[in-house]
Amino acid sequence: MDDIVGQLTLAEKCSLTAGETWWTVPAIERLGIRSLKVSDGPSGVRGESMIGRRSLSFPCGMAVGSTWNPDLVYELGGALAGEARSKGVHVILGPTVCIVRTPLAGRTFESFSEDPFLTARVAVSYVRGVQDGGVACCIKHFACNDQEHERMTISAEVDERTLHEIHLVPFEAAVREAGVWAVMTAYNKVNGIWCGEQPDLIEGVLRGHWGFDGLVISDWFGTHSTREAAGAGLDLEMPGPPAWLGPVLAEAVQEGFVDESVVDAKVRRMLLLMDRTGVGSPADKDDKEEEEDDPGRRAVARRVATEGTVLLVNDGLLPLDPAAVRSAAVVGPNASQLAMGGGSSEVTPHLRRSVAEALGERLAGAAITYEVGCHLERGLAPIDMRLIGGGGSFQAEYFDGPEQPTLGSAAAPFEAEMTHAARMLWVGPLRPGLDAGTFAVRIGATFTPDVSGIWRLGLESAGRSVLRLDGDVVVDNSDPTRGESFYGLGSELVEDEVTLTAGRSYALTVELWPRSPRVPLLGVRLVAARPEDGGEFDRAVAVARASDVAVVVVGSNGQWESEGHDRPDLSLPGRQGALIEAVLDANPRTVVVVNAGSPVEMPWADRAGAVLMTWYPGEEGADALADMVVGLSEPSGRLPVSFPVRAEDGPTGSDTRLYPGVNGEVSYEEGVLVGYRYYETVGMAPAFCFGHGLSYGDIVYDEVDVTSNKVRVRLVNKGDRTGTAVVQIYVRALDSPVDRPDRELAGFVKVAVDPVKPETVEWELDAAAFRHWDVSKKGWTSSAGRYEVLVGASSRDIRATVPIEWLGEATH
């Protein structure tokens, strides 16, 4: 490696410190150094394309955290590595291991948990699974990137103990235990300093204290300086072309502001990452990205969806006996297609299955009736891809030059490809010398409405755009007004009404061309709304009343939960709450399915026959849900976050200094009292507590024994079918030199228990179970003294409390 560094010119070295494109690092052909490619995860691997090429859509981070199953998460990591290889990707930008401070945060669904121990256990397995597959993880966002409000500028004001004891724990575990190969710095500041310019965090903690030898990558456009960032330890500015590193760094070296040895160290780390991920090896894939639909990976995705679903309430209704169900009403806006979160984690799935379809197959002898009931869109929703011909396919034709690619023009496209999403984005060069500011796109498909009447169609675009049906202009956005779409470079939504006939196929065409060659970004989002129907709410209630059982599928979607903005509150969008109440009034035999990425208010939960929290379960979610409803599988998830009764009940309360922040600063004054640690310490009951989740079995904790630091639990299933237990072990400090939470998760074991065979699980508590961060010694201390070990089924459902004496351990 030193030999290669010695052969590089200063310009070549510095070229390896910045992206060349949105997703790639430049190659150095004369030395055989190929380009490194990164891609968004963490819930799928999109590849370099942002125009709708298909990838397997995995369950979101909250669902993964809900599995409480590190072995399964390792398999998930392997499946993600396979997806990455199919796209020629060397680095997955994930997982997200930020701790959930407030459930209002827009990217809560990407995180694993509010608890640092659980997050760390899941993260370690995830990273090991991916990297054992020869693909790097870039764990993110380092550090305290816990809200979207002012995320590009906010300063997280956090004390040393809280930082180390809560927010850095998952990163530390990923480095020390999993050997993660890359870390992404966060957009925000910590205590007034940009995360990418924090020498104490990057060189001091990450590399010095933890021994990290990998690459430190900026979040996209999250670099703010040359000397400060380079000196702090940032290795790679993304995306390209660079603004602060790359050639600007070379100038800083030549002018004596940065020592060349600093650049050499960055290059060595880049070359090490390339070596670890096989860049340029015989097995390294070429640039072609495949849309592989692998059955093995799909099976893993379904298992994660199943084990990540939490049975919150069950009044004996689930599982349903298919033979006893003659009619079922499937109701709700997410019953037609389960939603996923928005932002950089979103991918275009291979499969679009509805809950109504999947349940209809499992309840083959029953009459299934679907009614939407209400809508949850924030403005117009993306056009329903099931109404687009060719299995939801557009043809994108590319034209050289910035002119409008009108239908019937003499110009011929130089290239064409199929895309599969209603939102398409081109960034940077389509090919060498042809940037997104210098070519145009014509997008075509057939559109077959499923309802007759007055539809609303619309466009948002980065660039100029026109929408045609059968050649006639329906929406004209050729003179766009600047809006918030496409990272603030796009237009406001332009929409119009058109009368359409159900079952008739229309030729749909979108013409998209640049507004300015100086903006290397071109994008379009096609939206549509069906004719308004004032009777859909009443019809949904009526079919529920007339059916043996009702399944109401509600939740959120990527318009409400997304990178870029937080949620305004914890309520279900639109009239969904009223719909649930009305259906429960009509039929108490109602299963409520919540398809959302973070906690929601559920004032109706105690009236429901059953409540399932599926999170965003990915493209296998509908079939996984149907299997669970009829008992072919069990929802074995447990909550990785607390569900408050109201948003202001949580640790950040209603104090705007703690959230969303005041004058560019957000205070972390809650300290170590995050999530359940807060609720248990102050004695407040959440709506659903951390670790909660029911089973289809009837499992009792028959014996609990704690000898020294070894915990042993015997479980007996008194039900008539196999059930799953997640034994949770908490520690309470009785003699602590610092204030501690009432209880802290220190271990867990997930196990299936058969009715005829008791199971015994064991867990050994090590020094980490008793530790706290000692500010005076700048390290962890496991203080000697009296403790209690709490063993239970959740943070509040404690089955045994056993006192023990811990002899202590030196600072480490």
Can you describe what each PLM-predicted range is?
Residues M1-V775, G779-R796, A810-H812:
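Glycoside hydrolase catalytic-domain context in secreted enzymes
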Residues P803-T811:
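Short beta-strand edge segments in extracellular beta-sheet folds
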